[in-house]
Amino acid sequence: MTTDTIVAQATAPGRGGVGIIRVSGPKANQVALEVTGKTLKPRYAEYLPFQAEDGTVLDQGIALYFPNPHSFTGEDVLELQGHGGPVVMDMLIKRILGIDGVRAARPGEFSERAFLNDKMDLTQAEAIADLIDASSEEAAKSALQSLQGQFSQRIQTLVESLIHLRIYVEAAIDFPEEEIDFLADGKVSGDLQAIIDNLDAVRKEANQGAIMREGMKVVIAGRPNAGKSSLLNALSGKESAIVTDIAGTTRDVLREHIHIDGMPLHIIDTAGLRDASDEVEKIGIERAWDEIAQADRVLFMVDGTTTDATDPKDIWPDFVDRLPNSIGMTVIRNKADQTGEEMGICHVNDPTLIRLSAKTGAGVDALRTHLKECMGFSGNTEGGFMARRRHLDALERAAQHLQIGQEQLEGYMAGEILAEELRITQQHLNEITGEFSSDDLLGRIFSSFCIGK
């Protein structure tokens, strides 16, 4: 339990019908007494005036008191539900901050206290922020699944399996004369493979959850007048970019946030790439390259009426040479309605080639399907959970150590090395739920939350 009491507005700033102020800590009951003038009945809504120190009424509304440990934070919690005007909220917060021992909450501090008081684990705490930030119905459902503990349960199942296997392996190590027989009887190998398979399934679901949370950054790049802005408009379903026959119309970066079957995409249109003499256009081209360097995928736009080539190295070798190897590329042969080429995905080599008409929209559905496939997005997120980059990293490290352990078991019957790899694997999994997390990591996570959460 912490010794200080915190206060913050729990509802979004600005005007609204209702505004909620949340107080958590050992002085929550004292705050209730001083602001409402009475001792509140636990877990009971009372309509009361909210008073200044001199007894004048600042507002009136509903007061709710939740004594520890049966509250969101696990501490004594007070909620004041008043009128949602910013002036009223500010007056009430100033009134509460005037009470000795009460301070303003840091961003995410209520959720942090809930985590520290074992009211939720770290993935559930993160899911609160993800639920608030959800940009689609599918993302909200996934965040809610994580908040309800689905991701945590999957991790806990893995950890329990690891613990049982570690006990067996370490017992074998304690009896050196029988260690080889223990390790070679097939149980260890079978249990280890089952854990690896289970972890692979969790990683696949977590990758879907990360896509749902973070989206995919797709940059449309190419020479001027290749149809980049027309493709942005076709994908977004609206006239986001100005389209003309004049080369260099787009001089800055244009962004649109869209969804394809629930998968969030950040589509970025960039200035046409060429040797420009105009200073403004030069700046736009440099910004284009900056965006390309940060992309998950680049759509390399080609005007199909100017070349028959399909290999980007034949079309523009300098572009291919400058593109980072880690970034996937799809070649888009635009204006297929004018060249008479067959629309859609023409082959699935690297890079994939798609023929379409950004102007008419023909072939654009094939591109949408292709983008989902590039991210490994199935679209079947019912029951899925939300995941973050740190979760994927921890799962990846866990998988690597399991692989090392399996190699040591199968190749050398090295029980001690296997036991150590299992221990490290468990440590990485515990980082996800917060059972083993540094204070620095916790600080970074909760500081990104809203104040009042």
Swiss-Prot record:
Instruction: Relay the cofactor remark from the entry.
Output: Binds 1 potassium ion per subunit.
- Binding of K(+), residues: 225, 244, 246, 249
Q: Name one GO molecular function term.
A: metal ion binding
Q: Which cofactor does it need?
A: K(+)
Give the EC class as a word: hydrolase
Q: Where does the record say this protein resides?
A: Cytoplasm
Q: What is this protein called?
A: tRNA modification GTPase MnmE
From the broadest rank down, the organism's phylogenetic lineage runs: Bacteria, Pseudomonadati, Pseudomonadota, Gammaproteobacteria, Vibrionales
